[in-house]
């Protein structure tokens, strides 16, 4: 099996993937600020890291996937003022929309920490930075990270010129340098606040992710994800404050970023007013089509929205459903057993080669468009050859391969859930295959192997009865 390689934004290289703890992957992805409905740009982030998690699990890793919910922020407060509603009501409304969107996209996140549930930990983290000399309290009661104290600042984003670091310009008058950033924002009348040793206020944006990721994944973890628009300043600031607080380098082993969803030449964003809400996209095209569409472009590249690209994803999904139904039908109808001839073996070799190339694509920096192209070859093979030569071994191999593909794609779950009757038929088919192979072993006088098969099946309640060259079987009641 191919070793997994992935692009690391920090080093600008594709690197061999080796988690901090062998066999266990800890992954943090920046989640939404819940002040509005999710749009299809958000959906790409959700699906890409879910599919990456699924592939790592397929390769035998245990993956802990954490994605935060920012439920207190300037945007939430502003929305609450505009609508004359409580900020908590705003956050809860759009949190529900976010979680419903994940469900429809078949995205499974292990933990969803919320900022408001971690205020105590945030205050403690800021105090550590103050005590270590990396942060200072301004006269207003706001707390800022002193960027010049962290020499590696700018490495993640590639911004070596300090003139490109300026941020949070509305606070520039009380900061030591224009590029220092807020860890704690002093309270203003009409805003929510919490008490802290340096004065009441609320957390800055960047500190939240550092605290919640380390709370659940420890002081060093494997993958930190998000869109490329978060590299600066958000992820640059996270890295600086976390390595300063923990004294651990690297804080994150692999920085993995997804490209933006584009509307023509512009990034899809609420500020530009060119968004398509996910809830509308679900009605128009369906979540399965959207999920596949997100995977048609390499995760690091921009994904340009066009009606035609969505239609192509829809056709691909319809073909996947068709091939699934065809394979299930063949598994029920192909009742006769025959020895594999040379032509059968060639088809089997093609199936195994397709599986190998599927893993080759995903192992090489998670190349989903290449993996989808390989799956297209699989579908053609089923429709043009296996459909007209439904030998059990070929049909069973194709079925297992389809399930493996769907482990990552996640769009065929409702078609691959077997009823008890289908499971019974599948089990009977597998036993018949094993019995047929055992008969050939007996004909070749490989009695030790034949006896071993009889013994192993017997342990599972399957009794074989030989009568001359023929074998029948029954289940022990």
UniProtKB/Swiss-Prot annotation:
A motif ('HIGH' region) lies at residues 32-42. Disulfide bonds: none annotated. One of its GO terms (biological process) is cysteinyl-tRNA aminoacylation. It catalyses: tRNA(Cys) + L-cysteine + ATP = L-cysteinyl-tRNA(Cys) + AMP + diphosphate. It holds the Pfam family DALR_2. One of its GO terms (molecular function) is cysteine-tRNA ligase activity. Its EC number is 6.1.1.16. Keywords: Aminoacyl-tRNA synthetase, ATP-binding, Cytoplasm, Ligase, Metal-binding, Nucleotide-binding, Protein biosynthesis, Zinc. It is found in: Cytoplasm. It comes from the Archaea. Its cofactor is Zn(2+). ATP binds at residue 270. Binds 1 zinc ion per subunit. A motif ('KMSKS' region) lies at residues 267-271. Belongs to the class-I aminoacyl-tRNA synthetase family. This is Cysteine--tRNA ligase. The gene is cysS.
């Amino acid at each position: 099996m191919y070793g997994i390689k992935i692009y690391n934004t920090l080093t600008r290289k594709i690197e061999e993937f080796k988690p901090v703890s062998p066999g266990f992957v800890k992954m943090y992805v920046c989640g939404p600020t819940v002040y509005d409905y999710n749009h299809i740009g958000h959906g790409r982030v959700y699906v890409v890291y879910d599919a990456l998690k699924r592939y790592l699990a397929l390769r035998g890793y245990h993956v802990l996937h954490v994605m935060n919910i920012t439920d207190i922020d300037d945007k939430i407060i502003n929305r609450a003022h505009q609508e004359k509603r409580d900020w908590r009501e705003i956050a809860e409304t759009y949190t529900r929309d976010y979680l419903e969107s994940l469900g429809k996209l078949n995205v499974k996140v292990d933990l969803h920490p919320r900022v408001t549930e971690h205020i105590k930990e945030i205050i403690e983290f800021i105090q550590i930075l103050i005590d270590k000399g990396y942060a200072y309290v301004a006269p207003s009661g706001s707390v800022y990270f002193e960027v010049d104290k962290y020499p590696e600042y700018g490495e993640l984003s590639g911004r070596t010129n300090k003139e490109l670091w300026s941020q949070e310009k509305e606070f520039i008058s009380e900061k030591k340098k224009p590029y220092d950033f807020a860890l704690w924002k002093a309270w203003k009348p009409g805003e929510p606040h919490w008490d802290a040793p340096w004065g009441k206020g609320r957390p800055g944006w960047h500190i939240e992710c550092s605290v919640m990721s380390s709370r659940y994944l420890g002081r060093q973890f494997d993958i930190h994800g998000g869109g490329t628009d978060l590299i600066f300043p958000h992820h640059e600031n996270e890295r600086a404050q976390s390595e300063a607080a923990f004294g651990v380098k690297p804080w994150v082993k692999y920085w993995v970023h997804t490209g933006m969803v584009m509307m023509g030449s512009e990034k899809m964003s609420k500020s530009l007013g060119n968004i398509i809400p996910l809830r509308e996209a679900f009605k128009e095209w369906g979540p399965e089509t959207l999920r596949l569409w997100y995977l048609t472009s390499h995760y690091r590249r921009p994904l340009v929205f066009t009606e035609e690209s969505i239609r192509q994803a829809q056709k691909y999904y319809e073909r996947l459903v068709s091939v699934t139904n065809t394979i299930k039908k063949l598994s029920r109808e192909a009742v006769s057993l025959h020895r594999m001839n040379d032509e059968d073996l060639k088809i089997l070799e093609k199936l195994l080669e397709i599986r190998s190339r599927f893993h080759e694509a995903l192992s090489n920096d998670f190349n989903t468009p290449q993996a989808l192209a390989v799956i297209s070859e699989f579908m053609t093979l089923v429709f043009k050859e296996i459909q007209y030569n439904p030998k059990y071994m070929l049909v069973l191999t194709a079925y297992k391969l389809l399930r493996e593909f769907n482990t990552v794609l996640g769009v065929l779950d409702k078609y691959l859930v077997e009823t008890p009757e289908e499971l019974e038929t599948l089990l009977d088919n597998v036993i018949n295959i094993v019995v047929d192979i055992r008969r050939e072993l007996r004909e070749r006088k490989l009695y030790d192997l034949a006896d071993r098969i009889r013994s192993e099946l017997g342990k599972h309640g399957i009794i074989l009865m030989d009568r001359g060259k023929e074998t029948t079987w029954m289940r022990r009641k």
